[in-house]
């Protein structure tokens, strides 16, 4: 699933190619693509027709574009395979095209939502006074947000009876971090994924946050991480940070720091990749 860097790449593309434009027509081609819009596809299309898109926004893995003078927003969640593509209006339809939005200008491009697995979707929601779509108001700020509170994050870590990777994936504590960048940040910080959060000192949690920010910024500079053709930017181009990963997906390969073969362990219906030498498990962990 796309994580913060991949979603931010898409947000920047929407900001460049879609913000400021007015929707003229919407086609909903698959009902699952608007299943989170409870009023249904007909209402979704009718409400968007004539709407002017504001500045594209993001929090964690969610992105949205305000409409109706920011009283509501078009919210997007890419799921496992969702793509928001800006395409020439005369370009052939993609096989898994789910939603098409046309604009009232002469630029000759349209916005398409393409989703092979249909886990993602688009929906319209009222905004909170802070400008967030109401349905994601509970999502915490992400580590690249200038208003992210490092001290509050450390305090929350110390108070929670959990482990460090579980905490990194808790979107009510810190958003935007998924399996890939959690493993990368933990490798850089030399922390085992099962390390209890209560044992982290303030300097260690600050170091971990710093590594999370560094790896996400590095991924952003390379267009994000693409393991297949399902993650692309709005122009259909893949990122290439997968070539720079230090932990994720590197089972059996030498650690880039010490040369020890990297390991993979099943973890919460996912996998965790780590170096058994650099990231020693806590004593209570088997």
From Swiss-Prot:
It catalyses: Hydrolysis of DNA containing ring-opened 7-methylguanine residues, releasing 2,6-diamino-4-hydroxy-5-(N-methyl)formamidopyrimidine; 2'-deoxyribonucleotide-(2'-deoxyribose 5'-phosphate)-2'-deoxyribonucleotide-DNA = a 3'-end 2'-deoxyribonucleotide-(2,3-dehydro-2,3-deoxyribose 5'-phosphate)-DNA + a 5'-end 5'-phospho-2'-deoxyribonucleoside-DNA + H(+). Its EC number is 3.2.2.23, 4.2.99.18. Keywords: DNA damage, DNA repair, DNA-binding, Glycosidase, Hydrolase, Lyase, Metal-binding, Multifunctional enzyme, Zinc, Zinc-finger. Binds 1 zinc ion per subunit. It holds the Pfam family Fapy_DNA_glyco. DNA binds at residues 96, 117, 160. Its cofactor is Zn(2+). The keyword Glycosyltransferase does not apply. One of its GO terms (molecular function) is damaged DNA binding. InterPro entries: DNA_glyclase/AP_lyase_DNA-bd, DNA_glyclase_Znf_dom_DNA_BS, Formamido-pyr_DNA_Glyclase, FPG_cat, MutM-like_N-ter, Ribosomal_uS13-like_H2TH, Znf_DNA_glyclase/AP_lyase, Znf_FPG/IleRS. It comes from the Bacteria. A zinc finger (FPG-type) spans 246-280. GO terms for biological process: base-excision repair. The active site is at residues 2-3, 61, 270. Gene3D superfamilies: 1.10.8.50, MutM-like, N-terminal. Monomer. Belongs to the FPG family. Involved in base excision repair of DNA damaged by oxidation or by mutagenic agents. Acts as a DNA glycosylase that recognizes and removes damaged bases. Has a preference for oxidized purines, such as 7,8-dihydro-8-oxoguanine (8-oxoG). Has AP (apurinic/apyrimidinic) lyase activity and introduces nicks in the DNA strand. Cleaves the DNA backbone by beta-delta elimination to generate a single-strand break at the site of the removed base with both 3'- and 5'-phosphates. This is Formamidopyrimidine-DNA glycosylase. The lineage of its organism: Bacteria, Bacillati, Actinomycetota, Actinomycetes, Kitasatosporales. The gene is mutM.
């Amino acid at each position: 699933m796309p994580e913060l860097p991949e979603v931010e790449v898409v947000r920047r593309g929407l900001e460049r190619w879609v913000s400021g434009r007015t929707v003229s027509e919407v086609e909903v081609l698959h009902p699952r693509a608007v299943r989170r819009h409870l009023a249904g596809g007909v209402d979704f299309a009718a409400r968007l027709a004539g709407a002017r898109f504001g500045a594209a926004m993001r929090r964690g893995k969610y992105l949205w574009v305000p409409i109706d003078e920011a009283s509501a927003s078009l919210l997007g969640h890419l799921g496992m395979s969702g793509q928001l593509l800006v395409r020439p209006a005369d370009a052939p339809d993609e096989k898994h095209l789910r939603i098409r939005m046309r604009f009232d200008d002469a630029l000759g491009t349209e916005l398409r939502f393409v989703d092979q697995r249909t886990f993602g979707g688009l929906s319209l929601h009222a905004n909170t006074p802070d400008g967030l779509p109401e349905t994601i108001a509970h999502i915490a700020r992400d580590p690249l947000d200038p208003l992210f509170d490092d001290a509050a994050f450390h305090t929350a870590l110390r108070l929670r009876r959990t482990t460090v990777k579980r905490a990194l994936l808790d979107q009510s504590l810190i958003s935007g971090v998924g399996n890939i960048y959690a493993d990368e940040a933990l490798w850089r910080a030399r922390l085992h994924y099962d390390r209890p959060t209560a044992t982290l000192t303030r300097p260690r949690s600050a170091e971990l946050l710093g590594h999370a920010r560094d790896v996400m910024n590095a991924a952003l500079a390379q267009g994000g991480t693409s393991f297949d053709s399902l993650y692309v930017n709005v122009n259909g181009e893949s990122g290439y940070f997968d070539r720079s990963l230090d932990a994720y997906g590197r089972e059996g390969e030498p650690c880039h720091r010490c040369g020890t073969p990297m390991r993979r362990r099943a973890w919460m219906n996912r996998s965790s990749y780590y170096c058994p030498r650099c990231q020693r498990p806590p004593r209570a962990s088997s």
